[in-house]
Curated annotation (Swiss-Prot):
Gene: rplE
GO terms for biological process, alphabetical: translation
Function: This is one of the proteins that bind and probably mediate the attachment of the 5S RNA into the large ribosomal subunit, where it forms part of the central protuberance. In the 70S ribosome it contacts protein S13 of the 30S subunit (bridge B1b), connecting the 2 subunits; this bridge is implicated in subunit movement. Contacts the P site tRNA; the 5S rRNA and some of its associated proteins might help stabilize positioning of ribosome-bound tRNAs.
InterPro entries xrefs: Ribosomal_uL5, Ribosomal_uL5_bac-type, Ribosomal_uL5_C, Ribosomal_uL5_CS, Ribosomal_uL5_dom_sf, Ribosomal_uL5_N
Organism annotation: Mesoplasma florum (strain ATCC 33453 / NBRC 100688 / NCTC 11704 / L1) (Acholeplasma florum)
A GO molecular-function annotation: structural constituent of ribosome
Self-association state and partner proteins as the record states: Part of the 50S ribosomal subunit; part of the 5S rRNA/L5/L18/L25 subcomplex. Contacts the 5S rRNA and the P site tRNA. Forms a bridge to the 30S subunit in the 70S ribosome.
Superkingdom classification of source: Bacteria
Gene Ontology annotations for the cellular component aspect, listed alphabetically: ribonucleoprotein complex; ribosome
Keyword presence, Lipid metabolism: no
NCBIfam families tied to this protein: PRK00010.1
PANTHER family listed in its UniProt record: 60S RIBOSOMAL PROTEIN L11-RELATED
UniProt keyword terms in alphabetical order: Ribonucleoprotein, Ribosomal protein, RNA-binding, rRNA-binding, tRNA-binding
Protein name: Large ribosomal subunit protein uL5
Amino acid sequence: MKSRLETRYTEQIAPELFKELGYKSVMQVPKLTKIVINMGVGEATTDPKKLDAAVVELEQLTGQKPLVTKAKKSLAVFKLREGMPIGTKVTLRGKKMYDFLDRLTNVALPRVRDFRGVPKTSFDGFGNYTMGIKEQIIFPEIDYDKVQKLRGMDITIVTTAKTNEEAYKLLEKFGMPFAK
């Protein structure tokens, strides 16, 4: 069964973008590929148990078991050795991706204090959008009383769009609240 946002994409958003952007084929219309959520836990170098809390929180958010990321290089400045766990990430595709984007745009982002929209400048030039969130407690799935430390996360939305303008129009139609 398709999610609400996925159904809206196939029935409403894709045909609108097809007309607006003047494509010759329906296959040219940009679509979402995946959403990658990354949570860097720098304190994990001294206390590995802090990473476990981040893994549990990310699993509650996405409904998917996160992958623990490890350091690629040793850096003496950060007391870091190659192979040490330093963060966690999840790659969402399909129904879970659309469900997460729906919750992000309609529930989580409006709960951010003094929220005026996400910046339009966070596109990478190839149609992908990356945003940072300072607190994980904006998501209703996270129990505020069980949070040991406020942690931020990076959310990257990967699309098939060729340019920033195409990706902007796609995400705007999905309901992403861009700053005016």
